[in-house]
């Protein structure tokens, strides 16, 4: 990546800001980690979401590629054929679509859409609608520079929060 910011730092920065934004909008939010020292497995994260009676499970990530020209954002969800959580595919897809469309519309990030993955433990342990947002490619100079910029991060957070509003049918002011 060009900015030198590690993915785990970016993910936590955005997650913290999103936490504040969603609380401001009236959502109850549970974070699976609030620092970079917390070690928590994907299974434990999914179990926490169930224990807290969460309605959705959103995982915040940034992408990387061997090819520095690849850029854009996407969401990842289970397919209907997923042997573990196929029954979550339709609602997870709707969640992923709401979030990625709003995120890309707000940030101007290239929209790579909803992608189906059945080999991600971050998805396969879930018991509620789940999506992973890959916010951009840290291996792409433009995406990485944008994602490290505080003003751009505000757009990222707004886009994700607006997508969650869209999913729940909440009208924005």
Regions flagged by a language model, labelled:
Residues 1-2:
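Short, surface-exposed beta-strand segments enriched in small/polar/acidic residues
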Residues 5-173:
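Active-site-proximal helix/loop segments of hydrolytic enzymes
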